[in-house]
Amino acid sequence: LPADLPDREVAELAFQRRRTQTGSDFLPPQLQKVAVISCVLRSDDGLKIFSLEGPEAEVIQRFYDGLEKYVPQLVSWNGGGFDLPVLNYRALIHGLDASRFWEPGRNNYYNRYQDLHLDLMDVLAMFQPRNNAALDEVAQLAGLPGKIGVGGAKVWETWLAGEVAKVRDYCEVDTLNTYLLYLRYQRLRGAFTKEILDRETQLVRTHLSGLDKPHWREFLKLWNDS
């Protein structure tokens, strides 16, 4: 392809090829470009919701650097099926250092059946793909807001329109829905008492009430109304 071909046209060619191959224009992980990584961090210092933004290689490296520094338990929804393969392929392409992620041991990030990375959807489905469920549906069934704003199918168009903040907000909302379901999971498996679950959930509500951003105001309103 010509080096000066606009991104939109390059992507459309890739979409057309993918539709011909599979009937869907959803690109394989190695062809996905990382625009933002959103995180909820719960530590002894409290709760933080934040996003990593910038050039793709920088965003991915900062994510892996965070694993190196904090060695957190990663919690995702289909992270083993999509998010982490995307990050790993793109890190490989950029020649990045993700050594902590790949560090072997009895508990590591890449083993499906260990805890350092908990793919919540995969675990709840008992590692049977036929039982997989959409984050939005499970979140709403649990009385959470689910997805708001941009839908996943519109992320590319929104990004092309330069509405980066909308993409970031979409990712942050997904991340918080996942975290709130994780709190329920901790109760489900007996790691939390009801009192701890209620306290951790209230911590999220209190944190959101102090964030003066439209997507969090909408999230909190929908949550309170549910």
Which residues does each PLM region occupy?
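Conserved RNase H-like, two-metal-ion catalytic cores of nucleic-acid enzymes
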Residues: 1-66
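Metal-dependent phosphoesterase core characteristic of DEDDh/y 3'-5' exonuclease domains
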Residues: 32-53, 67-169, 173-196, 202, ...
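Acidic, Ser/Thr-rich low-complexity intrinsically disordered segments
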Residues: 206-226
